[in-house]
Structures are given as C-alpha cells and as structure tokens.
Curated annotation (Swiss-Prot):
Pfam families: YfdX (PF10938). Residues 1-21 form the signal peptide. Keywords: Signal. This is Protein YfdX. The gene is yfdX. NCBIfam families: PRK10316.1 (NF007645). It comes from Escherichia coli O157:H7.
Length: 211
C-alpha cells in the first residue's frame, strides 16, 4: 500500500512539474525575446549616436573645404547641420559616452564616432592563423563581429581596436564659435574654429586580446 501511495505521489509530482514547465516555457521564451530586443535596441541607439557624431565631423571637414574653395554659404550650411546633429536633445549622449577618458573641457565626455579593428603588430603568420583570419573576415562581412572575434581569439591571433573619440562639449563649443564667425564673414577665423573641432578627435587603442 505504501509503495502504491509513493508511486502515486511521484506520478503527481512529475505531472505537476511537467505542467509547471509547460506553463513557464512561454514566459522564459518571452523573457529571452525581450532581452534580445533590448540588446538590439541598445546597439541601435549606440550606432545612431556614433553615426550622428561621424556625420557631424564629416560636415566639419567639408565645410572647411567649402571655405577653401570660396563657398562660405555652403560652409555655413554644413556647419549649421553639424551643430544640429550634436545638439539633438532626443539623443542620450551621456548613456553611450566612453568612460575613464580625461577631457580638456570640464564636464565633457568622449563619444565613439568610429572604430576599426586590426591585427596586432606582433602577429606572426601561420597556416592556422591565416585560415582563422579568412573565416573571421567572412563573419565580419555578414555582420557577425562577435563570431569573428571569437574565431581570432581561439586561433591565438592578437587583435587591436582603434576607437575614434569626439569630445562632445568641446566640439559643440567650436561649432558655435564657427557659426558666429561665419555670420560675421570672418572666414579665416571660422576655418580655425572648425579646425579646432576636427583636431579634438583622439584615437584610443585597446588590445581586445593578445597572442
């Protein structure tokens, strides 16, 4: 009789466990989906911020070129566009600032506007590493940066990442100065202000992993 009762209890426990798992499977799947969506949303926001900073800096460079070619109106248009890109209040700049980097202006922050990945200078070619680099390039072409980095890491290939950082407040100030000078038709001085914005960019190199 005891065996029958125990068997019945075990069956009941197993049955309830199955029901619990079935009931919670959609919840777990939903949570995982939400996490993936949040990660994608964060990555998209960071990418948008980088693009805004990069486009603003391109506008600065082309504005200087326009001044060189005697087209101040085009330079003014591009400078205003760059300023608008960096003054977008809907953008959460601080959330995606590069931490731990000292800036020249108080309360400033560096924003990553571009990045490049390369092999470390100590790299020594071997057939295995060359094969890993080929596979990594294929994965990068498909947008799988994480997979590409893992391929290189497993093959013992040292990788460096160069991040191009823009001091947000300093660049905004330089653009504001350039706008005022362009309005006053002080084009030489405006060019220097734009150059100051361009010169504020720094390159931060970091070893992702070493061989």
């Amino acid at each position: 009789m005891k065996r029958l009762i125990m068997a019945t209890m075990v069956t009941a426990i197993l049955a309830s466990s199955t029901v619990w798992a079935a009931d919670n499977a959609p919840v777990a799947a939903q949570q995982q989906t939400q996490q993936v969506q949040q990660t994608q949303k964060t990555a998209a926001a960071a990418e948008r911020i980088s693009e805004q900073g990069l486009y603003a800096m391109r506008d600065v460079q082309v504005a200087r070129l326009a001044l060189f070619h005697g087209d101040p109106e085009k330079a003014k248009e591009l400078t205003n566009e760059a300023s608008a890109l960096l003054s977008d209040d809907s953008t959460e700049w601080a959330k995606f600032a590069k931490p731990g980097k000292k800036t020249n202006v108080n309360d400033d922050q560096y924003i990553v506007i571009n990045a490049s990945v390369g092999i470390s200078e100590s790299y020594v070619a071997t057939p295995e590493k060359e094969a890993a680099i080929k596979i990594a390039n294929e994965k990068m072409a498909k947008g799988d940066k994480k997979g590409a980095m893992e391929e290189l890491r497993l093959a013992g290939v040292g990788v460096m990442e160069n991040q191009y950082l823009m001091p947000l407040k300093q660049t905004r100030n330089a653009l504001a100065d350039a706008q005022k000078l362009l309005d006053k038709k002080q084009y030489y001085e405006a060019n220097l202000a734009l150059k100051g914005a361009e010169d504020g960019i720094i390159v931060d190199s970091e070893a992702l992993f070493v061989n």
